[in-house]
Amino acid sequence: MTKGIVLSLYDFTGEALRPWAEAGYHCYAFDIQHPEIGKRDTFEGGGYIEYIQMDLWNLNNIDLLQNWFKNENVVFGMAFPVCTDLAVSGAAHFARKAKADPEFQIKASNHARWCASLFGALGVPYFIENPVSRLSTLWRKPDHSFHPYEYGEYIPDAEAE
């Protein structure tokens, strides 16, 4: 018997799901980069991570996820929407992008909003990860902020790229 379902959107690696799967949860990582025929990693604790290809920039697919999981035991959600058009590290390119599409940042911020709407409709706690960005202005301020080094660990030379 599963402890519940954990959803992760815009998630290619599934790394954030690993502790959940190891603890016996059924986890789903959705990302457009996954192969059409997904794969499943299983863990000793009875959990798994299933990798599913999905274009999350298509609102119809967000609605599809809501329909798939609305009657399931979803216990947590996480999302890592693309930050390319929002992160302040790319501010030097904002003017050029706005010239091509004045709505480019509104469109980009919608992806985070859609994730929040999905998790809200499913009634589950969640987080949406994004670096320092225009999201704070276009949508809402974060409830929590952190630096990646706070959650990382030392990488031995043999494992470094």
Model-derived features: positions:
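Conserved active-site and SAM-binding loop architecture
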Residues: 1-161
